[in-house]
Amino acid sequence: MTDGFIAVIPARYASTRLPGKPLKDIAGKPMIQWVYDQTVQSGAAEVIVATDDERIAAACRDFGAPVEMTSAEHASGTDRIAELAHRFGWDDQQIVVNVQGDEPLISPLCIAQSARLLGWHPEATIATLTSPLTDEAEFRDPNFAKVVTDKNGWALYFSRAPIPWPRDGGMPMVRRHIGLYAYRAGGLKAISAAPPCALEEAEKLEQLRALWLGFRIIVANAVEPPSPAVDTEQDLAKVRSYLERARRPAR
């Protein structure tokens, strides 16, 4: 069942590169409100913002978003969501989507797709999405995580390295990983409770912990292109510029 999936938006104030990121103004609304509004359109039965900062919580209350305070000690959004899974006693089969709080233009269709994908694969603990990666510079860029799957879409490995490596040259068929995850709550709690593994610490990709623990991750191509994440002032300026252009009346 995915009709009742829950979407959680982890949001923290203390971003290293862009402090206060969730509250940055974009076309008259804080970024977290853009993410919330997009997520509501996904059809989730419930949308919750999970934060450790009262300033973010107050902003969410102002625009009517349900918000839960969580520990400031969490190392990741996954851990923040796992705290809610324990707090609310979510059933182990409950599907929970982790929506990145720094993607104000995130696709509602992709959020729903990730939940639906997990629902279709009862043997999976996580579902996630990809998009084709055709630019060679991005293929070599460690900021773009890549994923290799088997013929049925099961993840074999995620890496910041260029995989699969074209030994004979050329550009292989590469899939860029999109950081949108649907979890079963039981697996989410188990993954969060486990210590980081060596692969995760080397690559700084937390999904590798799930693979290392033996959980299965199903992967599919996203129905829409990935939305830009806001990590820096430059990213923020690009999103603001895009929305300003999009809101201008056609001539």
Predicted regions and their residues:
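N-terminal glycine-rich phosphate-binding loop and ensuing alpha1 helix
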Residues: 2-51
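Short, high-confidence coil segments that cap the C-terminus of an alpha-helix
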Residues: 44, 92-93, 121-124, 215
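Hydrophobic/aromatic residues located in beta-strands of well-ordered beta-sheets
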Residues: 7, 47-49, 96, 127, ...
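Conserved core of the sugar-phosphate nucleotidyltransferase
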Residues: 107-197
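Short phosphate-binding loop-to-helix
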Residues: 48, 54-116
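A conserved hydrophobic position in a structured secondary element of the catalytic/binding core
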Residues: 51-52, 106, 183, 231
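Conserved alpha/beta core of the MobA/IspD/sugar-nucleotide pyrophosphorylase nucleotidyltransferase superfamily
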Residues: 172-251
